[in-house]
Every structure is written in C-alpha cells, then in structure tokens.
Amino acid sequence: MELLQYTFFQHALIGSLLASIACGLIGTYIVTRRLVFISGGLTHASFGGIGLGLYTGISPILSAALFAVLSAFGVEWLSKRKDMREDSAIAVFWTLGMALGIMFTFLSPGFAPDLSAYLFGNILTITWSDIALLGGLALLLILFFAMYLHPIIYVAFDREFARSQGIPVQVFEYVLMMFIALTIVACLRMVGIVLVISLLTVPQMTDNLFSHRFHRIIWLSIGIGYLSCLGGLMISFYLNVPSGASIIFFSIIIYAICKTGKSFWLYLQR
C-alpha cells in the first residue's frame, strides 16, 4: 500500500499496536473491577499536569503523568476513608485537575498554546519518543500481568477472597491504579483527553459479549483495539477528520455490529 511508504503512517501503526496491548491489559482490569468512572476522572485530572507543563516549560506528558499518578493515589486513598464516598473523591480530583489545567494554560507565557493535540489527539503526529513511551509501558504491563495474573484476577473479582489468600490487596490496587494513570497519559497523543477512556473500555465491552474469561478478554481486547485503530486511521486519512474521534467511532461501530449480531443469533435460537 502507498500509505505504508509514509514515515508518519508507520509510526501510527506501531503506536497503535503498542497502545492496543497496553489498553487491552489494563482496560480489562478497569472493566472487570468497574473502575470506568475512576479512569474517566483520572483522564480529566491529567489536564492539570498538561497545564503545569505548558506553564513551567517542562514536557506536558511528563507533568501529566506525575499529576495523573498522584491523582490516582489520592483517589485510592480518599475512597478508602469512611468519611468520603468514592464518587466524591473522583469528583475532587476531576475538577481540581481541570481547574488547574485551565489556570496554568492561561498563565503560560507567550502565545496561547494549542491544546487540540492533548484534548482530541492525533495519532498521525506521534514521534519515536511517543512510541518509546508506549513500548516501555506495554513491556512493563506484559511483565507485571505475566508474573501476577492470578493475584490480579482475585483482586479484580473479589478483594476479600484475595485478602484471605494472603495477597497484599492494597499494594496491587495502588500499583494497578498507577498503571491506569500511566496508560491514560501515554495514549493522550493518540486519542486525547476527551476520548481516551473509550480506548480502555469499548474493546472490553465488545469482548464481554462473547467471553467472561479474564485472559481471553485481554487477547480479544488487544485484537479489537488494534483493528479499531487501523479502521480509524483509514477514516482519518481519507476523510481528513481527527484520528482520535475516528478510532473511537470505528470501535463503537464494531461493538454495535457485534451486539446486533449476538442479539439476532440469540433470537434465532429461541
């Protein structure tokens, strides 16, 4: 294909694969543990780090990662307190991150920075440094899940049972929250703050239509996630629309087709 001759498209293909691996792994934990709302809160909280990076002149991705991880730990800690509900803790960091992001952005010296790359993403503009970040994260997640798959499953499905088996539940929860935060930040350049949560949940929702086994959902999520990225890339390139939106749109089309197909199949089995 002619597209494969372009360096930016090669970068997009590699980045899509690495992002699909990372999102397939940690996204399965998110959906199984029902942490979608928390992940959405961390996504918007990371905007505070982006604003801080633009204001101080450091890498916005680096500051967003630091802000997201600290917010993840803060949500995890506050949600365990008896005087604070989990949704309230999420709201605190969600709104704090957005407020700080807006303030720091307006205080940034010089011309007003272009935030569209962080809000909506553009996978066609990712660089080797973005690919290296995604690759390092994907490798860490592969190693962590390979070494501790069963404890992760226990923590995801039944915290009390995991604790009865001697598993340090709180340690795993904090580590996995850190990985959620880092995955969100690593994918910002691809689909942006507005849509990154869909990349972590829609493929898993599609897989849940056909399987409830944790490891099978991981593999299917990686495949569907990558297929969504490829389809979204084609739509983005030929229609000249934002790649982040087209990737999520294509993934939801896949979900709708699978959902309709399964419903029709079950209807025929009556």
Regions found by a protein language model. Name each.
Residues 1-21, 269:
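Membrane-interfacial amphipathic/re-entrant helices at transmembrane-helix boundaries
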Residues 6-11, 82, 90-150:
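Transmembrane helix-bundle core of multi-pass membrane transporters
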Residues 13-18, 61-66, 91-92, 131-136, ...:
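Hydrophobic alpha-helical transmembrane segments
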Residues 28-111, 208-219, 238-239, 263-264:
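Short loop segments and helix-boundary regions at transmembrane helix junctions
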Residues 45-55, 93-105, 125, 169-174, ...:
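Small-residue-rich segments of transmembrane alpha-helices in multi-pass membrane proteins
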Residues 130-203:
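Helix-loop-helix "hairpin" substructures at the membrane interface of multi-pass membrane proteins
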Residues 190, 194-245:
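Transmembrane alpha-helical segments in multi-pass inner-membrane proteins
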Residues 241-248, 252-270:
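Cytosolic-side transmembrane-helix boundaries in multi-pass membrane proteins
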